[in-house]
Amino acid sequence: MLIKVKTLTGKEIEIDIDPTDKIQRIKERVEEKEGIPPSQQRLIFGGKQMGDDKPASEYSIEGGSVLHLVLALRGGL
């Protein structure tokens, strides 16, 4: 099924996933297209951050769903 991942800049990335795919796999697909390491990605759907080890189906993600990508940048001195 096709879903979209929307970045903070408004860019939409189309990704083909299976409902059984874990969120980690979706992050890996985003990395393939955008070069953003999964460790720096936070995917939000329905106002909730999704855990890497859960399948897309657990969050009721369906074809046409739009996930929001937020970058988890680590700060430091």
Swiss-Prot record:
Domain of life: Eukaryota
Residue span of region Interaction with ube1c: 70-72
GO biological process terms on file: cell population proliferation; modification-dependent protein catabolic process; protein neddylation; regulation of protein stability; regulation of proteolysis; regulation of ubiquitin-protein transferase activity
GO CC term, one of those recorded: cytosol
A Pfam family it matches: ubiquitin
SMART domains to which the protein is assigned, alphabetical: UBQ
Entry keyword set: Isopeptide bond, Nucleus, Ubl conjugation pathway
Entry annotated with the keyword Nucleus: yes
GO terms assigned for molecular function: cullin family protein binding; protein tag activity; ubiquitin protein ligase binding
Zinc listed as a keyword: no
Purpose: Ubiquitin-like protein which plays an important role in cell cycle control. Attachment of nedd8 to cullins activates their associated E3 ubiquitin ligase activity, and thus promotes polyubiquitination and proteasomal degradation of cyclins and other regulatory proteins.
Protein name: Ubiquitin-like protein NEDD8
Gene source species: Dictyostelium discoideum
